[in-house]
Amino acid sequence: MEPTYEEYLANHGTIVKPYYWLSFSLDCSNCPYHIRTGEEARVSLTEFCQIFGFPYGTTYPQTKHLTFYELKTSSGSLVQKGHASSCTGNYIHPESMLFEMNGYLDSAIYNNDSIRHIILYCNNSPCNEANHCCISKVYNFLITYPGITLSIYFSQLYHTEMDFPASAWNREALRSLASLWPRVVLSPISGGIWHSVLHSFVSGVSGSHVFQPILTGRALTDRYNAYEINAITGVKPFFTDVLLHTKRNPNTKAQMALESYPLNNAFPGQSFQMTSGIPPDLRAPVVFVLLPLRDLPPMHMGQDPNKPRNIIRHLNMPQMSFQETKDLERLPTRRSVETVEITERFASSKQAEEKTKKKKGKK
């Protein structure tokens, strides 16, 4: 294959021109080296916080796109890490650069058959708008390499709101990509994944600073992203939920903050009743119960045209608090149907008991 990129050795890794015709541009601060590997992939804490909306949650629309990636073997060993940044001068997204035919990842996997799993950590979910076609390129890449599995973690959804002109394309493309589960995982960054990204890709952060508790504002944004991607794709995300572990860490301030937060701001279109009239400090820490993050084994499988799009995955989730259970029952899930069925069974059993008592009384 004739690659479209050029790679150069740097002090702590490599720097890559994803398209060999790119040159230095005054319109883009990252041109022409939009892909960086190894320790060259690290960014400053300030840049990371601004682009990923960490640690307080996304507060404004993000125009810059930054994607960290890891290439791993089937056993989970790291082959390479790196990042790809968007080109503001040529308006190119990171996923488009990485998954381009004859591009960097295409060449990397073609020349190293031990790579079996790709993990992306994106500030924006991939799109499929006409000028980018990111998801289409990812989809074609997976068809070319049927032994590769892919996990995509994002800090915010990109152009999926109904009032955006191209949202229908993006939502439909996300559904198509999610239908490849379990080969493809779409999930928000949350919990311990934040700590992993900080440790691997952010410079100047080490020790206890990496494992600081996730703040309430960021945690609520992650939870909203999880429900939203589920509503779009019909596939429950593989994510770490926000749950307070009061037994091991009785942080009453964090608990009160989470339970009294006006959830109608975190879940647009839903009506929630506040337990307190004062909004909490979104900087209050939240204690997480982490679900184990495992690398999926390589799967040699094709797309089944008869496979339904709506896939429900059953995970053993940690026990939820009473307040969280009340809030989630208001969401449009199947819980209400199950509740009705259980109530009907209970009523039927109660009637049966009354009939038995009447029969005994007649005797």
From Swiss-Prot:
Its EC number is 3.5.4.-. One of its GO terms (molecular function) is metal ion binding. The keyword Hydrolase applies. It is an enzyme of class 3 (hydrolase). GO terms for biological process: mRNA processing. Keywords: Hydrolase, Metal-binding, mRNA processing, Zinc. Its cofactor is Zn(2+). Zn(2+) binds at H93, C127, C134. Coiled coil: none annotated. The active site is at E95. PROSITE patterns: CYT_DCMP_DEAMINASES_2. Belongs to the cytidine and deoxycytidylate deaminase family. Putative C to U editing enzyme whose physiological substrate is not yet known. This is Putative C->U-editing enzyme APOBEC-4. It comes from Macaca fascicularis. The lineage of its organism: Eukaryota, Metazoa, Chordata, Craniata, Vertebrata.
